[in-house]
Each structure stands twice: as structure tokens, then as C-alpha cells.
Amino acid sequence: LGIKATNIVWHNTSVKRSDREKLLKQKGILLWLTGLSGSGKSTVATMLEQKLNDAGKLTYLLDGDNVRHGLNSDLGFSKEDRIENIRRIAELSKLFVDAGIITIATFISPFIKERVKVKDLLESDFVEIYVDCPLEICEKRDPKGIYKKARNGQIKDFTGIDSPYEKPINPDIVIHTEENSLEECVDKIMDYLEKR
């Protein structure tokens, strides 16, 4: 999408990202968790945020469902709306990262093209984390009861059932929630961040 507004100019401010990061004693970054519904994105992100918070880091967790209660409440689940959902979150995440915040985003984000756009916007501040869990395990978990509804035809365009999920080609981190414990998954991300 292009900018529709005319007669606007970017206003530079005197406080820069480096000033905010120095104040916070941390670097802003976007940790983007992608995977099927029920794969464990929100569960992993919640524990990850707690561990980072316990370590004295300023974080913000952007959860796919929570964001749809406010900022993206006008969006449905058509392909176009999913694309706009991710675009808005990418722009919001860029602002949070510029503020020096460790931003954790948990979005199915089923399309590679849209995740690449997020990466292009955030550049080296983007860390793609693929929460890999087989569809059949996600369906067994079904914490929201939505796979059952999708299989019964009550929900259309449901990712993994009648709408595709495009697996990341070269994610920065892959976690396997059906093979590893929650703690092991979170520790893998923490180890990555410590080495970064």
C-alpha cells in the first residue's frame, strides 16, 4: 500500500533509537513466531516474555488474537485481511523496536511473501522463529475448538485446513513443540539471543 495522505513530511526528532537503547540498556528487536494455530506460539511467547522480563528486559508481546480485539478489529480472515493484519503489525513492531523494546509477535502469518515484507521492513532487527508442530498434533490440542469448527465447515479459509500455511524457508530459529518441552523451546530462543 502506498501513502494516501498528501502534504506530509517526516519529522525528525532529537531523541534517537540509540538514545533509547542506551537508556534501556538493551537493543530493540522483533521476535516473530509463526506457525499453525495450536502449535504453541502464544504459550512459548508468554514464557519467553516472562524470562526476558525476569532478566530485566523491557518487552511487549503482540498476540494475534489480542490485536484483533483492538487495532485490527476491523479485519476478518480473507487473504486480503490477513495481509493487512500482518502489514499493520509489522509497522507497529517497527515503532516498538525503534523505542528499544524487545517485541515478541505471535501470528500464524501463513504467507511467505508477507513474512518477507516484515523482514524487509525490520531488516536485521527481525528474527523469524518457526514454531513447527504437525497439523494432526495442533488439531488434537485445539485449545480454541476451531479446528473442529473448520472441519465441520463452520469456519472458512482456516489455515491448515482449507487455506494454506507456507512453511518458512530459512527461519532463524526452529522449535518443535511436539518433541521438546516448553522450557527447552524457550531456552533455545534465549540462547540465540545471548549469542546475537
Question: Model segments located where?
Answer:
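Small-molecule kinase domains that catalyze NTP-dependent phosphoryl transfer to phosphate-bearing small molecules
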Residues: 132-135, 140-188, 195-196
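The conserved Walker
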Residues: 37
